[in-house]
Every structure is written in C-alpha cells, then in structure tokens.
Amino acid sequence: MIVAKKEVKTDLWVYDLLKQADIQLDAQGSDIKEINEALKTASKKGTGNVGFPEYVGVVKDYLLVIEDKAALDKHIKLDDKNCISIEVNAVRDYAVNGALFYAKHLARNTTYKKILAFGVSGDEKKHKISPLYVDETEFYRELPEVQSFISFNEDNIDEYYTREDIKDCTSG
C-alpha cells in the first residue's frame, strides 16, 4: 500500500513536470488509436496482454513514452554486458528498462520512427530523468540525463534532436 502511494506521488510529480514544460501526454493509455492498439499487447510480463506506460503521447513527429518509479534504486538495471536489461523482472521493476520496453514495442507496432523514452525515478527533491532515443529498427541510444522535460516541448524538441546529434548516430 505504501509503495502504491509513493508511485502515485511520483506520477503526479511527473505530470507537474510535463505541465510546466507545456507537454500534454496521456496517462495509462492513449487517445491516439494507433498507439492504443499497440499497447493492447504491451504487457511488461511478456504475456501479450495489455500494458500501459505512465505517460505516452506525441510532440510533433516524436512519440514520447515515460515510465516512472518512486524509488531511486529502481531507476535502471544493467545486464552482464552493461546494457539495459530486457529480462521481465527488470522491465517490470525498473523505470528505464520499462521505458525502453514500451518504446521498442511501440517502434515495432506503430508507424512512429522517432521515439523518446524516459525512465524517471525519485521525487521532486531527489530524482533521475534518463532519456533514450529509439528508432524504428529498435536501435536505442542512451542520452544525457535531464532535469525537466522543457527540451521536449513543441518549441524545443527539434533543437534537442539536432543538438544531441541523434540523426547522425542512427543513419548508419
């Protein structure tokens, strides 16, 4: 019960960050039919059942996916090759792992070619926000941590994409 309450607080804090950045994403699903259809088979347990990230939506031609966890120690789990683990337990229990899972699932099951996934953990005082770029081939790249979502609103997202040189790293 206490964990659930902390998760809700984290969800609300992330919602506030999105609002401050003037980004409107949907919680636990999507109003966009194509995304909602894809999420019908996005269970993090790998069962093929429905699964929803905390927030998902579109800014320009970018699909944004956010998975959050209240505990900082549930931010990311790496495998023995120092890559983001895709094991079911890691995907279910860790913010970055879950965000990557949803981003790859959406890359496979929608027409979106540019996906920014965010693993968020902690709270207003102490937190981590880790963006990942995932393209339509499911290639992913970890990007530098950010403090807010301001770089990802309609006014700034193209500049962020260019500044982080994402295009160059994905064009072969």
Feature-to-residue mapping (PLM):
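A short, conserved, highly charged catalytic patch centered on acidic carboxylates
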Residues: M1-L116, V120-L132
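Intrinsic-disorder-associated interaction segments
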Residues: V3, E7, F139-E142, I150, ...
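Glycine-rich loops and low-complexity Gly/Arg-rich segments
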Residues: A90-D93, R141-V146, N156-I157
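Intrinsically disordered, low-complexity segments enriched in small/polar residues
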Residues: L100, P131, E138, D158-E159
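Short, low-complexity, polybasic intrinsically disordered segments
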Residues: D123-F152
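Non-catalytic nucleic-acid substrate-recognition regions in nucleic-acid-modifying enzymes
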Residues: S148-G172
